[in-house]
C-alpha cells in the first residue's frame, strides 16, 4: 500500500519564484508546516491491526502475507491502541532466546502478543507514539526522527481509530509530488559530500559468510534497519534488511540461524534487482529521485570500486529537507 492522496492537497502557489536559491532553504519546511497528516491519507487503503490476544505465530504470518512491516496493537480490555508489533520485536526475541536453554523458540510463537510484551519484550517495550490527523506533516517528520521510529500511526483523537500509518517513504513521496512547484533551494544541487548527509563512520555491515544469528545481534546493537553485505574486499554485493528476517517466520527456518546471510537471502534472489547505490559526488536531487522511484528505504554510498563508504537513509533525507534546510544534522 503505497498509494498517496495527491488530490487532497492543492499544489502551493509559486509565490517565492523571485527569491534567490539561498533564501529558498526553508521552502520544504514551509510546505510541511502548511499540510496536515490528513492530507496524505489515501481515500482507500489497507490497514492491518492486531488484537493483543492474537497468537504471535498468526500475527507474524499476517505481516508476511500482507507485505507490511508493522501493525498497531489493540487491547480489548483497555479499549485502546497500546503499541505496535514490528519486525524488530521478532528480531529481539530471536536473538535473545535462540541460544537459551530455558526457552524453545517454537514455544514462543504459541504465546499471545500480550504475553510477549509483558514477559519477553519488557526491556525493549516502548509506549505508543502516535499523531493526530490534524497535526502538520512537519510535526510528523519531527516525531519520526526525534523518537527514532519508522512508523507513526495517525489516530483520530475523537473516535480513537487508527486511520493510517505514516512512514518516511510515504511522506517523501508526497513531498515529491509537489516538488516541481517550488523554487529549487541551492542545497538540492549540492553533492552528498558537500552536505555531509548520511552515516559515514562505524557502518554496520556483514560479510557474505556471516551467520544470520550474528546479523541479528548487529541489528539489535546498532539499531539499524539494513546491513550491506560485502565480499572480502569490502565491495557491496547484497543487502540484508530487517524485512528479510521476517521470512524466517514465514518459512519456519528460524530454528537454524547459523546459516549465512547469503543462504538466507536466496528466497528472494529471483526478483532481487540488486543493491541500490549512490556516490558522494551525486546531488541531493538525484539521490531523492532514486529513492522515490525505487521505493527503497536507503541507498548504499560506494566508491568507484563498489566499496562501501556510507549509508544515506530516508530519515537522513527528510531531516535535511525539512528540519535543517540542507544543513548537516546538529
UniProtKB/Swiss-Prot annotation:
Ranges annotated as biased composition (Low complexity): 1-12
Any one of the GO CC terms: protein-containing complex
Every CBS domain range: 42-102, 124-186, 197-259, 271-328
Binding-site list for AMP 2: 69, 169, 241-244, 268, 276, 297-298
Pfam family name, one: CBS
Residues engaged in binding AMP 1: 84-89, 129, 150-151
Short motif (AMPK pseudosubstrate): ranges: 137-158
Binding site for AMP 3: 150, 199, 204, 225-226, 297, 313-316
Record: residues binding ADP 2: 69, 169, 241-244, 268, 276, 297-298
Region (Disordered): 1-25
Organ and tissue specificity: Highly expressed in heart and brain, also found in kidney, white adipose tissue, lung and spleen.
Role played: AMP/ATP-binding subunit of AMP-activated protein kinase (AMPK), an energy sensor protein kinase that plays a key role in regulating cellular energy metabolism. In response to reduction of intracellular ATP levels, AMPK activates energy-producing pathways and inhibits energy-consuming processes: inhibits protein, carbohydrate and lipid biosynthesis, as well as cell growth and proliferation. AMPK acts via direct phosphorylation of metabolic enzymes, and by longer-term effects via phosphorylation of transcription regulators.
Domain comment (free text): The AMPK pseudosubstrate motif resembles the sequence around sites phosphorylated on target proteins of AMPK, except the presence of a non-phosphorylatable residue in place of Ser. In the absence of AMP this pseudosubstrate sequence may bind to the active site groove on the alpha subunit (PRKAA1 or PRKAA2), preventing phosphorylation by the upstream activating kinase STK11/LKB1. The 4 CBS domains mediate binding to nucleotides. Of the 4 potential nucleotide-binding sites, 3 are occupied, designated as sites 1, 3, and 4 based on the CBS modules that provide the acidic residue for coordination with the 2'- and 3'-hydroxyl groups of the ribose of AMP. Of these, site 4 appears to be a structural site that retains a tightly held AMP molecule (AMP 3). The 2 remaining sites, 1 and 3, can bind either AMP, ADP or ATP. Site 1 (AMP, ADP or ATP 1) is the high-affinity binding site and likely accommodates AMP or ADP.
Name under which the protein is recorded: 5'-AMP-activated protein kinase subunit gamma-1
Organism (species): Rattus norvegicus (Rat)
